[in-house]
Amino acid sequence: AVYKREKYIDYMNSRITDYLVQANELVLPIADERLIGGLFHVVNDIERIGDHAENFADSAKTRLEWGIDFSDKAKRQLQEMTEKAVMILEYSLEMFKNRNYKHMAEILRLEDEIDELEKKLQNSHVKRLTKNKCTPKAGMLFSDTVSGLERVGDHATNIAFAILEPADSTDDDDDE
């Protein structure tokens, strides 16, 4: 289901981006131009979240194939981080839908918590490795998952910012 959904997200990303490019070529009020600029970022962030979901599915398949099981503590840590990333995404999508600041403080708090949690989990992962409580393969999968969850939190936070403070489309970046 994850792979099918990611393929659909990629398809929709392409279609929506094409539409936004066409809309951006029209003579529009500045506010609409800025909104379109913000939407480009939202579409990209959603696509990147889909990529991370696919990476998580790949990691889960690899864990099964290699017979790797995380410790209960590692599972709890990943669960906590996952819940925070999902909350940010839910809040950001609600803000996107309603175009309000309702959850911004909570998003920023959760984003800070995720950033701190990533540092803490990566450090505890290194300690488990050095004490032989974790195999290098399991450690690699754990570390990649932690990093991916932190990036999901970043992309979800970007969605809230992009819709509330759209990019200034008056900047010409023709040489990029």
Model-derived regions, located:
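Cytosolic, long alpha-helical scaffolding segments
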Residues: A1-E176
